[in-house]
Amino acid sequence: MRIDPIVFRAKFPKRCSLEQCKSRCCRGGVWADVEEREIILRNADLFIPYLRPEAKDPSSWFGETAEDRDCPSGMAVETNVSGDYCVFFHPDHGCSLQKAAADLGRHEWEFKPRFCIMFPLVVSEGVLTVDEDMDEVWCMQRENRTDPILSAVEKEVSHLFPEEVSRRLLTEVYRRETPPAILSGYRPKKAAMP
């Protein structure tokens, strides 16, 4: 995986603020790895109580699949949209997958697609970069971007990447050095199989 140097210079708010943004990053759904879809469907009963009434049917949760080298399995699937938002979004608590996991005493991201956890970082065509396409979202507006992006999402980076990769990313941002162009041997973590 190559790293876009912008990752080391980009800014982000100190933390997400759902009160400010109203979860606008959940608009339009997201691409998930097909293995993540299978985990979500296997655990559907855990999430149904947290979903909006119009999104409770598991057969309506996912749409098209496509080849995607940025997914650990090589295949991506889109989450469907209900009322402009991802089917897993709920206006009272944000991501239903995350809320259910936390309420059940599990890791908050156990079921959440990695591309959701990763935002505002994204892997695109093998390059870790910043998703600048969502500039209308509160956290991506210039006046709200106050802290180094990697320090703002340090917990997410540590969760998503192997220890040596996350340590290297975080060390580089704190040193403010030029990043390595390529992290040899990087493979994204595969979704855990509950």
Segments the model singles out, each with a brief description of its role:
Residues 1-194:
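Short loop/turn segments that flank or connect secondary-structure elements
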